[in-house]
Amino acid sequence: MQEIMQFVGRHPILSIAWIALLVAVLVTTFKSLTSKVKVITRGEATRLINKEDAVVVDLRQRDDFRKGHIAGSINLLPSEIKANNVGELEKHKDKPVIVVDGSGMQCQEPANALTKAGFAQVFVLKEGVAGWAGENLPLVRGK
């Protein structure tokens, strides 16, 4: 214990950085464990789409969506979800909803908004459309 105190005394900035990092990891872990939105793999997404008639919500810009999207996807912008302007998605509240974007990094907030709007099962696709395409899974062009 004495060595730890000496280290902290000699390296306060490094010690604060380590404590901040530890707190960030703990908060992130706690949030992911208590979140109603779960991150799923491409295999799990495929199973949900094929077996449970899941609906895919693509958050990318319209041009990116037209260049290639998962078959049957509904294109909604995060701002539309935030404003609760979900249109045709409204009738799918009881089905699993898979939220995707380009990389899977910007999906959590819109997915949480869908959960708050009453959607029962909301998932986020890990690595988004980039991971989907990287595994040579089918993409539909146009529309």
Swiss-Prot record:
**Pfam families reported in the protein's UniProt record:** Rhodanese
> Which GO CC annotations does the UniProt entry carry?
cytosol
Disulfide-bonded cysteines: none
Give the keywords, sorted. Acetylation
Domain named Rhodanese: which ranges?
50-143
N6-acetyllysine PTM positions read 91
Question: Any coiled-coil ranges, and where?
Answer: none
Q: Does the keyword Calcium apply?
A: no
What is the name listed in the Swiss-Prot or TrEMBL entry for this protein?
Uncharacterized protein YibN
Which species is listed as the source?
A: Escherichia coli (strain K12)
Gene encoding this polypeptide?
A: yibN
